[in-house]
Amino acid sequence: MPTEAMENTVANLKESLLAVAGEEPILEIVIGDKEKWRFLNTDENPWPEYISKLLSWEEAKEIVDYDFDSGFGGTESHPIMAWTQTRVIFSVCYDGSEWLASAPRNPTDGITPQHYGGG
């Protein structure tokens, strides 16, 4: 099932990923770039070598282990895509409010599609 918006506006990206993955291990992840690195109070990307690269969970888990304000306003976390054996996890944003959702990794019968990100 897709994950709903987080009720608490403070979230941790690593914990959020693990919660959406549930019992399945995260296999790989791609971390997107940001114009502003607000959570680190800098405009400079501290990890340019990791952006848009396919990383193992072992490589990425420390990079995504940070708190951010997931509430309305401006986005603060990295946009991500992550893969488990059966799911694809991705970032969703509506008016600056951020959360993660997932979809089946392969075509699946009997699921109910929904809109993500507002609307």
PLM regions: where:
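N-terminal domain-onset segments
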Residues: 1-69
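Short, compact, well-ordered microdomains
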Residues: 72-118
